[in-house]
Amino acid sequence: MERNIIVLDTTLRDGEQVPGAKLNVQQKIEFAQQLKRLNVDIIEAGFPASSAGDFQAVQEIARTVGDSVSITALARAVKGDIDAVYESIKLAQNPLIHIVLGTSNIHVEKKFNRSKDAVLQMGVDAVKYAKTLLPQVQYSTEDASRSDFEYLWKTIEAVVKAGATMINVPDTVGYAVPDEFGELIRKINERLKNLNDQVILSVHCHNDLGLATANTLSAVRNGAEKVECTINGLGERAGNTSLEEVVMGLKVRENHFKASTNVRLKELIRTSRLLTHLTGLDVQVNKAITGENAFAHSSGIHQDGLLKDKQVYEIMSPEEVGADSMELILTARSGRHAFKNAVEKLGFETGEGDDFEALFEKFLLLADAKKEVYDHDVFYLVTQHRTHEEVSSHLYELDSFQVVTNDMYPTATVKLKKGSETFRDSMVGDGPIDALYSAIKALVGLDVQLKDYKINSLSRGKEAIGRVNIRIEYQGKIYSGRAMDTDIIKASALAFLNGINAVLLDAGHDSQAPVSAR
């Protein structure tokens, strides 16, 4: 009998812990809406106790997306965290409190500096309290793969008796190997079914040894009923289990695993592309399922075989995962309906009334200039439109700029707006971008360091749109900025400014430019 595997996506919580991948509230909602289209069963929307911004994002996701998908958020085994989770997710139709507490010796002794019994009691008390708030509670035994098995089981048994409805077994540091992890899940599953066969057994793997997908599939083979993953395998260090790899592994090897998911496969590529666009973190070209070369064949022998029968060298088709529907070609005559459909296919909400009309007018201007508008052009239009909407009085806008470049003294003059104020300054630099960034830094008064600068072409021909991704460091934290424009110097300025605005949003830092620079 085929089992249905529950899929929890934790891109917005665990995935967002990647330096520079932080999203604002609107971006998180945008991505959560796409996860809803993807039809994941549970969205882990964040860690609400960590900041007011994360609390707000989780709350908005629960309110706007939680009508048909379960929403959860992470809590440590303390009352304040559990309260924050409850308050942020309670508007969802099927909310779930997720509690995490370590079980390995190193966690108990070094992290908590308590006895094993004391840590176990912390977990039991946390579950009992969470159950007074909501009926559904998941308990994660952090670092389970390095834990003493009998203590691990003692913890699981105690929290199940306290009311936990899901037990999640994490390979927190990616230490396990597939046969070992599969055996661990088999043993837990065997005991858990005898204890309470209504409790769901889940796994959460990390990719430090490149084994996250293999370990997750081994766990499913050995009785796991739920998997926790991220899109593109996004996550801190080497990343998390890749959702698309697990889902397609179960699909392609259905006879082997005798398990399936509710995920809409045709939304996989679209979801991956949206995440790449929002975070600015590109997928490696040879990444399974979602990489640019995942369905590319350059070998003559392979091409010959494919022409005779695609199944000679393809175990899945690009059409299955939505790769066939990504290329959109629009013209000025495409009309509102076609444009609206194109925007929605790329995972964005189109808005209504005046908002949509303003976006459509921008599309017509671009279509007149470029003649043919592709999917990346639509991405550009929508994100630039959204960015303009989100600018507030304490963030900077680019008013104008001028760059003069020569062999001696490249110079940039920049004028910024912040609310009703304007600021202007000129700087020289080692090239046009350095001069531009030096002028912006002087105006905003923040000592940010440029850590990474990348530029890519997003569309075709001499009118191609360039995308600039930058990463900056401020007070030890990494922030990202990205922008697109047919003028790459302008895109560079906007990306840098977006990174600085991310700093301001994160820190609530209301910087002032020097009076002499105004």
UniProtKB/Swiss-Prot annotation:
PROSITE patterns: AIPM_HOMOCIT_SYNTH_1, AIPM_HOMOCIT_SYNTH_2, PYR_CT. Belongs to the alpha-IPM synthase/homocitrate synthase family. LeuA type 1 subfamily. GO terms for cellular component: cytoplasm. It comes from Geobacillus sp. (strain Y412MC10). This is 2-isopropylmalate synthase. It catalyses: 3-methyl-2-oxobutanoate + acetyl-CoA + H2O = (2S)-2-isopropylmalate + CoA + H(+). Keywords: Amino-acid biosynthesis, Branched-chain amino acid biosynthesis, Cytoplasm, Leucine biosynthesis, Manganese, Metal-binding, Transferase. Residues 5-269 form the Pyruvate carboxyltransferase domain. One of its GO terms (biological process) is L-leucine biosynthetic process. The lineage of its organism: Bacteria, Bacillati, Bacillota, Bacilli, Bacillales. Pathway: Amino-acid biosynthesis; L-leucine biosynthesis; L-leucine from 3-methyl-2-oxobutanoate: step 1/4. It is an enzyme of class 2 (transferase).
